[in-house]
């Protein structure tokens, strides 16, 4: 079963996790984290405007339910200090849409920070975490946009502190499953296979921007996902999900929408206003996948490359699927054959992590 499936109705996902009963500030690990970060802020008279970025697992791009919890809890805890004004993910997205800065890249931990002045935000809090089953160690950093510096911090929580705060109904084993990404070993192997096999080695004649419509990279079962892209060239696009199980799923174009053209210098969502008639919903199996957009200025050339995939679609399973090796052959054939460069190609990809409800 494909991980990403289209449905006709909009699904409104429930709250990600059950809120625990009120605890004291001393017992709240996220309040401790907030206080530790605030203590490292430079001297200031007005509240510092901080966005809260992504928190990934270890030295991987993968995320888990805890990734979402950390961000949401920090967005609540930081303003309580009266020293921080949190810039929400939607506001960061709006600043990026207006061309202020590349928020999609800066929310990722470890991304180099170039000096940039943005009126709406001064820094981004982001980080990585690891767990040994009894503790969770979080390595955070505040990336300062105007100066280009990074302020680092480290906190260690007891697993039972985290469990009592956000998953009081879970056993220790269940809590550990919520801390680590789904199918982490297989997913990471799949991600490495995609990059090492050079599936993404499409000729880049121009740069395109790609992000999820809501700026997230981790999604719960039943939630909808949409991809937003922008190109400096009018071009035709295909959206492909390279799954950890070795299959590659063509999400777009599909039986509900076949118009692949996106205009020059305009953000377009797939699915969205211009590309409507279908939705993409998160379903099992869960893990972390590479979602890739392939762009081409020649529709016939693009469609030729995905024609074989499209023939695999059925009424019950409308998204065509191909094995990894066949996709490698197609991508390499497309770039090798078009040596004239009269047809322009490009690609962009992101990692999306998913997990089940509960």
Regions found by a protein language model. Give the residues of each.
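Secretory-pathway glycoprotein ectodomains that are cysteine- and/or Ser/Thr/Pro-rich
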Residues: 24, 117-122, 131-358
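Active-site-proximal beta-strand/loop segments in catalytic clefts of secreted hydrolases
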Residues: 53-55, 89-91, 128-129, 240-242, ...
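Sec-dependent N-terminal signal peptides
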Residues: 4-13
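Short, solvent-exposed, polar/charged sequence segments at loop or secondary-structure edges
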Residues: 61-75, 79-139
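A structural "domain/chain start" motif
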Residues: 18-81
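Short, charged beta->alpha transition segments
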Residues: 37-40, 112-113, 278-280
């Amino acid at each position: 079963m494909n991980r990403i499936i289209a449905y006709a109705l909009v699904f409104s996902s429930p709250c990600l996790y059950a809120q625990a009963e009120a605890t004291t500030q001393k017992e709240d690990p996220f309040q401790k984290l907030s206080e530790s970060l605030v203590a490292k802020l430079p001297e200031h008279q007005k509240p510092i405007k901080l966005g809260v970025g992504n928190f990934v697992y270890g030295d991987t791009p993968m995320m888990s339910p805890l990734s979402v919890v950390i961000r949401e809890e920090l967005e609540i805890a930081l303003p309580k200090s009266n020293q921080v004004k949190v810039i929400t993910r939607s506001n960061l997205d709006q600043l990026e849409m207006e061309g202020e800065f590349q928020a999609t890249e800066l929310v990722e931990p470890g991304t180099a920070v170039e000096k940039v002045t943005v009126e709406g935000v001064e820094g981004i809090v982001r980080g990585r975490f690891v767990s040994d089953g009894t503790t969770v160690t979080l390595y955070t950093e505040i990336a300062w946009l105007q100066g280009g510096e990074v302020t680092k911090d480290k906190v260690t929580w007891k697993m039972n502190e985290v469990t009592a705060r956000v998953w009081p109904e879970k056993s220790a084993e269940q809590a550990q499953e919520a801390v680590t990404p789904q199918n982490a070993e297989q997913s990471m192997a799949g991600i490495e296979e995609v990059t090492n096999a050079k599936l993404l080695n499409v000729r880049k004649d121009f740069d395109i921007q790609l992000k999820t419509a809501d700026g997230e990279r981790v999604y719960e079962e039943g939630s909808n996902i949409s991809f937003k892209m922008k190109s400096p060239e009018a071009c035709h696009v295909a959206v492909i999900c390279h799954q950890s199980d070795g299959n590659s799923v063509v999400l777009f174009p599909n039986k509900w929408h076949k118009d692949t053209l996106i205009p020059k210098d305009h953000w377009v969502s797939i699915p969205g206003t211009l590309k409507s008639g279908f939705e993409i919903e998160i379903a099992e199996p869960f893990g972390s996948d590479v979602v890739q957009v392939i762009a081409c200025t020649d529709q016939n050339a693009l469609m030729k490359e995905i024609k074989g995939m499209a023939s695999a679609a059925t009424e019950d399973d409308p998204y065509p699927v191909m094995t990894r090796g066949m996709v490698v052959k197609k991508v390499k054939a497309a770039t090798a054959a078009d040596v004239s460069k009269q047809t322009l190609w490009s690609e962009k990809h992101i990692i999306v992590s998913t997990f089940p409800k509960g």
